[in-house]
């Protein structure tokens, strides 16, 4: 009879651990995960030379899976993460993947940036400043992207340009923000491809 309290405590402890584990699992599964969706129709062949795309440089707060928004009507200097929504990977990595796919779809050849520099003379470097959903009122927001692209040829700077795009969100939530940022990404990438085609880079 004296062992009953010990057995009871052990059972209670095991139940508590199982309950906490279930709560943790539920919390993880309640997270809604977003990416940038399917690629838009391919651009026409613009005759780009072979190039590599380096891993983007981003501010520390953008180097995460968090989906950020800003309430410009309340405090334009504060970025806030959505509680139950996140990206499938850091957003600028999603952008990098999309840029590479778009370069290839436009007739270019994307090489690995880890290869010998002599084998990859042209490298694109991306420095990101913003990738957020901006609310100008509680009912309306835009997906905003701001970044700088530099073209290097054998480590020599060839050209550099800043790109900034906004796209209106269809809904005032994370889903609307993800779609808006996808549209802003595609518009930015189209601008980048057009700019690259005008540089007359050597093939």
Where are the model-predicted features located?
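Structured, soluble extracytoplasmic/luminal domains of envelope-associated proteins
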Residues: 83-107
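Soluble periplasmic/extracytoplasmic beta-strand elements of cell-envelope proteins
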Residues: 50-55, 70, 123-127, 144-150, ...
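Surface-exposed short loop/turn segments
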Residues: 24-42, 105-155, 170-171
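Sec-exported extracytoplasmic/periplasmic mature domains
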Residues: 100, 104-108, 193-201
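A structural "domain/chain start" motif
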Residues: 23-92, 199-203
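Sec-dependent bacterial lipoprotein signal peptides
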Residues: 1-23
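Short secondary-structure boundary motifs at beta->alpha junctions and helix caps
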Residues: 75-88, 156-194, 201
């Amino acid at each position: 009879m004296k062992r009953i309290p010990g057995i009871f405590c052990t059972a209670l402890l095991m139940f508590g651990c199982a309950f906490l584990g279930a709560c943790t699992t539920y919390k993880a599964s309640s997270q809604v995960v977003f990416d940038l969706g399917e690629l838009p129709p391919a651009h026409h062949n613009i005759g780009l030379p072979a190039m590599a795309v380096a891993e983007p440089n981003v501010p520390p707060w953008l180097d995460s899976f968090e989906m950020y928004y800003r309430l410009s009507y309340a405090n334009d200097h504060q970025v806030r993460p959505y509680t139950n929504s996140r990206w499938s990977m850091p957003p600028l990595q999603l952008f990098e993947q999309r840029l590479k796919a778009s370069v290839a779809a436009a007739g270019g050849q994307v090489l690995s940036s880890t290869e010998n520099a002599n084998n990859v003379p042209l490298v694109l470097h991306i420095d990101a400043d913003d990738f957020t959903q901006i609310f100008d009122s509680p009912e309306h927001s835009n997906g905003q992207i701001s970044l700088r692209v530099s073209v290097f040829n054998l480590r020599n700077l060839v050209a550099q340009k800043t790109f900034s795009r906004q796209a209106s969100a269809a809904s005032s939530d994370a889903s609307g923000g993800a779609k808006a940022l996808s549209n802003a990404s595609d518009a930015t990438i189209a601008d980048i491809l057009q700019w690259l085609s005008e540089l007359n880079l050597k093939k």
